[in-house]
């Protein structure tokens, strides 16, 4: 193994000098290990990643953990390969850090477990699937108005407390239960508390055994936060390429990936670009996003929570992410206040899959009519607020009447929330979703009360609920 010595420490950046021209390659992992000298001291076990060749037999590296205690002259060993992490079934139900070390309270992953390097090429053109296939989620508002594509990338927008985590959990649950699929969750620059809560909530709801979790928390150095998304993606790729699975890959939050890259870029001395971001922003984002795709064997479908700095959608970080997205799911606080869950905004959410050649003519026509009805209702709300319903024409009254039923019917109970609500969760196939809304638009259920449509699954449940309310059906 090639050995070198630490020549300079600049916070999370460490320069290492190697002898006799034995320079490690870019992205190679370098280890610095030193046992504790006494009981009161903590030993050093640090992994670095080579970022630059500076010349004079010296490389500049980024630390994957704190550099506390690292001194000039310490021995550093080139491992001869990039950071490699465990892949396969051993990762399910477990929590890892950026290096693939388990950080849950269970036994360490077996030493002989298969490992893959986190830096890999995106699938070549001949490996890519040319078919556009819809990923059925069982969530009505998503499947009808902003359907997800297998191997696609979805942006999940929403503030604090509007239900991003519950939506993520329900998607993990539905993919596991209905499709037998696997999920990988990457917490990038996450609050440790949120990651901890998510792990225990998923354990309680029973979906953890179909999920691998990787965390690079907010308090960790930028190197760890920048690479943790690649660690999660490497685990997801194995399930796709080796096991032929349709994998869900969650990134929360993709903005933190960019933010960490910006910090690393500044530490490496690169000239900043627009708004202080790294000049390699588009390249780094592309390298990550291009690996998320459908192949002839399986697919990795990514759902990415996106923080928008100061609500400025022209900021380079979110703007670069948008270029890669196939669909957006926007969560709206006003809907949570109305008791509509999931609080997905049916007018702001979009998908390029909502086209007649992909979803079919009937689905497309119903979805567009639902949107136009809700849009007209939105336009009429100001008039209703000022003058009241009585001032509307008969046609507009009918629009409002149906729009409110549609709005309530877009809600449903979630399986993962059963323990809180006491209501059984529902999974609604796309065909039944389309049929239900088609019948509402045709006026078949105009005589039923609005509350019968709230938090139900199939349209038959609306009729049952109305009967329970004492309404003649």
Swiss-Prot record:
Transmembrane segments: none annotated. Disulfide bonds: none annotated. HAMAP family: ATP_synth_beta_bact (MF_01347). This is ATP synthase subunit beta. One of its GO terms (cellular component) is proton-transporting ATP synthase complex. It comes from Bacillus subtilis (strain 168). It catalyses: ATP + H2O + 4 H(+)(in) = ADP + phosphate + 5 H(+)(out). It is an enzyme of class 7 (translocase). Pfam families: ATP-synt_ab (PF00006), ATP-synt_ab_N (PF02874), ATP-synt_VA_C (PF22919). It is found in: Cell membrane; Membrane raft. Belongs to the ATPase alpha/beta chains family. Its EC number is 7.1.2.2.
